[in-house]
């Protein structure tokens, strides 16, 4: 029996990165990108209807950045894993994001294999559902 695929919402202002992450994650047997958003406002609008298991969230975005969106995403998706995926490599920023409710912080320079491995570590245990 094939395990349930983790539903992923990709939030980043760079359209090419959203598309790339969608393609890269969709080819994996255990992930399915269910939606994308270009900023925190769009992410909040889509969060409840898409009900993702994982939110891959950029920090630096126009309109509403990742840190601003984080509390609202956490409120709407209490069981989802929120992963900051950012080009910023500052330890203080990572600590701030984790303190604000993020489950993990991954730098954008990370290889695809490392990103997928980290997302697999965050998978929900069998039998536990976000609905």
Question: For each predicted feature, which ranges?
Answer:
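Active-site beta3 strand of CheY-like receiver
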Residues: 50-56
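Receiver (REC) domain active-site loop signature in two-component systems and cognate sites
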Residues: 61
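Conserved acidic segment of CheY-like receiver
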Residues: 4-25
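Alpha4 helix (beta4-alpha4-beta5 surface) of REC/receiver domains from two-component response regulators
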Residues: 68, 89-106, 110
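C-terminal output helix
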Residues: 92, 110-123
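Acidic catalytic/metal-coordinating carboxylates
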Residues: 39-42, 65-68
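Active-site T/S-Asp motif of two-component receiver
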Residues: 10, 57-58
């Amino acid at each position: 029996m094939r395990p349930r695929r983790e539903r992923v919402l990709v939030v980043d202002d760079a359209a090419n990165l959203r598309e790339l992450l969608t393609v890269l994650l969709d080819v994996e047997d255990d992930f399915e990108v269910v939606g994308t958003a270009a900023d925190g406002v769009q992410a909040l609008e889509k969060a409840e209807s898409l009900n993702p298991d994982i939110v891959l969230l950029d920090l630096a975005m126009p309109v509403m950045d990742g840190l601003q969106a984080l509390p609202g995403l956490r409120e709407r998706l209490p069981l989802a894993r929120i992963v900051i995926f950012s080009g910023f490599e500052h330890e203080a920023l990572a600590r701030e994001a984790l303190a604000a409710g993020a489950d993990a912080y991954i730098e954008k320079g990370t290889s695809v294999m490392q990103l997928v491995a980290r997302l697999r570590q965050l998978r929900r245990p069998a039998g536990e559902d976000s609905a």
